[in-house]
């Protein structure tokens, strides 16, 4: 609509300029501009009195089905309180040497990195769970030479759900469930929603514990949860 309107304005203005200069050009476009102002006033009056303009197009939210992987460092505040610089350096090394390359190998996309955690999107839920398992196994091996109170351990939650897509973020219940599952996981462990697990069952090599329905924070209904216990070497 607006492209046509401004095109007409330009044409009228051009005709006026060719016919008689600037003053005639203004006379040519004045009627169209007057109608535009009248339209704007009418819409403003409707908003002012609480009336919605049902003719105005409502922008649609972009949505898609995605496998969501949420992770966080266990006891990060405690670790930084003991030695902030050492913790930051070791965590940065974990991201560079373990987590980032593992996510890339499994075709994941890091949506958000909070420093001590991340939100990652996968097209395949099988890739998401395999990535989580690999990260936890590698971290378990690295932690065998680290004192227990200084270990960097992750919790991971994986969900399959519908998400709202923004240019640099994703939102919605699918993301919220993944974050709550992460909080339910044991240090070094993984919690997976039933929707996600039904897609990966028989496709990943891992011991799985059926936790049954679990109450997740700020979610009205219990969610059926499956847990992949910590790999050997974690606490």
Kindly give the residue locations of the regions a language model identified.
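Catalytic NTP-binding/metal-coordinating core of nucleotidyl cyclase/transferase enzymes
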Residues: 51-138
């Amino acid at each position: 609509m607006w492209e046509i309107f401004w095109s007409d304005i330009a044409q009228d203005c051009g005709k006026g300029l060719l016919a008689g200069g600037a003053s005639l050009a203004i006379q040519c476009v004045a009627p169209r501009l007057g109608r535009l102002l009248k339209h704007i006033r009418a819409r403003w009056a409707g908003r002012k009195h609480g009336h919605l303009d049902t003719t105005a197009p409502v922008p649609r939210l972009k949505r898609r089905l995605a496998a969501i992987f949420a992770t966080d460092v266990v006891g990060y505040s405690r670790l930084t309180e003991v030695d902030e610089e050492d913790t930051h350096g070791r965590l940065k090394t974990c991201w560079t040497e373990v987590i980032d390359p593992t996510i890339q190998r499994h075709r994941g996309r890091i949506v958000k990195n909070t420093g001590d955690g991340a939100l990652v999107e996968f097209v395949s839920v099988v890739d998401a769970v395999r990535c989580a398992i690999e990260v936890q196994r590698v971290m378990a091996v690295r932690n065998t030479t680290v004192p227990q109170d200084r270990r960097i351990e992750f919790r991971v939650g994986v969900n399959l759900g519908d998400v709202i897509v923004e240019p640099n973020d994703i939102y919605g219940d699918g993301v919220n469930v993944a974050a709550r599952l992460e909080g339910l996981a044991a240090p070094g462990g993984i919690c997976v929603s039933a929707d996600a697990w039904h897609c990966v069952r028989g496709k990943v090599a891992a011991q799985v514990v059926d936790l049954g329905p679990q109450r997740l924070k700020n979610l009205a209904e219990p969610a059926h949860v499956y847990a992949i216990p910590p790999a050997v070497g974690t606490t």
